[in-house]
């Protein structure tokens, strides 16, 4: 889709950060739960601390709620309207750095990223219940949910 080339170009230039905020079906799920607003804001602030010129690319099933809830210092972009799942995971994995939600979709985006010096911020607890989880890499930054 040619109309998305400017969005793709923005991702490819500079310190692009994929911010994945999952709402929807996770809100009422007793196993997964949802990362708190405090987690996401702390992750955003930490990413700006590590990458002062970060460009935040927001991917969410409720972009309007994200716009009303979170504060960004500069350079924020929202996923294009009408993206299918394949397009979305492609754009997300093009980013250099990642703020993950506790979802496998979010996890795969950072895994598919080819940038070797990526910064990954993830919730320290992946599930709302005590289930063993070994998806974390040693170099990730874990924040409380």
Regions of interest found by a model, annotated:
Residues 128-145:
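Leloir-type glycosyltransferase catalytic cores
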Residues 25, 71, 85-88, 104, ...:
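Residue-level preference for alpha-helix termini and adjacent loops
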Residues 1-85:
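Core catalytic architecture of nucleotide-activated donor-dependent transferases building glycoconjugates
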Residues 15-17, 54-56, 75-76, 95-98, ...:
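Hydrophobic beta-strand segments of well-ordered beta-sheets in folded domains
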Residues 79-82, 124, 144:
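Residues at the C-termini of beta-strands that transition into short coil/loop
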Residues 33-34, 71-73, 113-115, 134-137:
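Short, glycine/charged-enriched secondary-structure capping and boundary segments
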